[in-house]
Amino acid sequence: ISRYGLFPFASSLDTCGVLTRSVKDAAIVVDAMKGIDKYDQTSWDSSDIHLYEAIDGKVDGKKLFYIKEITDISNYPDASKELKRHLEIFYETIDKLRKVGVEVEEVSIDKTLLQAIPSVYVCLSCAEATSNMSNLTGIIFGPRGKGDNVMDMMKDHRTKGFSPLIKRRFVIGSYVLQKENQERYFVNAQRVRRLIVNKMKELFKTYDALILPVSTGVAP
């Protein structure tokens, strides 16, 4: 799905998707939206892929996997009732899938690699967001800030225009992109991401899909 027209955050991570109430609805919407777009160089020709037509209801023999370290309640010593219930529902879903012929297997992944994911995400996403949004100065884009000179106008615009959370991300992004920090943080985060990607590619040689709870709780 083309990203043209959307506001970029982290270019190497941003993807488009749809939220629907069923797999069929998702297939219909994505079939209508997918395809190559000359305005998005990351898009590709998917005209030979027809998701809705591929839905035949036959799941027998499909192989799914879930990650033990994420779904094992013993890994959450202070688990809330909500989290416990979410995981109960997850395992109930696994049982239902197995009853209709889907093979679902538990896979263990190195905890060190899994624990690195949040840090890698923060490092890469904040760095890319800082770069992507550096043009929002109030001079060319956005409302004009107040001030007697260009620097004061940009400071006023960016101070008022971004939330505290976004500002914190800019601070992190600017820090990891500094020349003296790039190798230690940004480049190493890219290397760890490659390890994560390679691990997932290896698993998808055996399995058709990954199944996991969407989150450990509702949004705050």
Residue ranges of each PLM-predicted region?
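Acyltransferase
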Residues: 51, 82-110, 141-146, 153-157, ...
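Predominant activation on well-ordered alpha-helical scaffold segments within soluble catalytic domains
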Residues: 24-31, 91, 130, 134, ...
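Short helix-loop capping/hinge segments that flank enzyme active sites or metal/cofactor-binding pockets
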Residues: 58-67, 71-76, 123, 127-197, ...
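Short connector loops at secondary-structure junctions
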Residues: 100-121, 172
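A short helix-breaking turn/cap at a secondary-structure junction
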Residues: 1-88, 152-156
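Generic secondary-structure signature for well-ordered alpha-helical cores
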Residues: 18-24, 28-39, 95, 99-103, ...
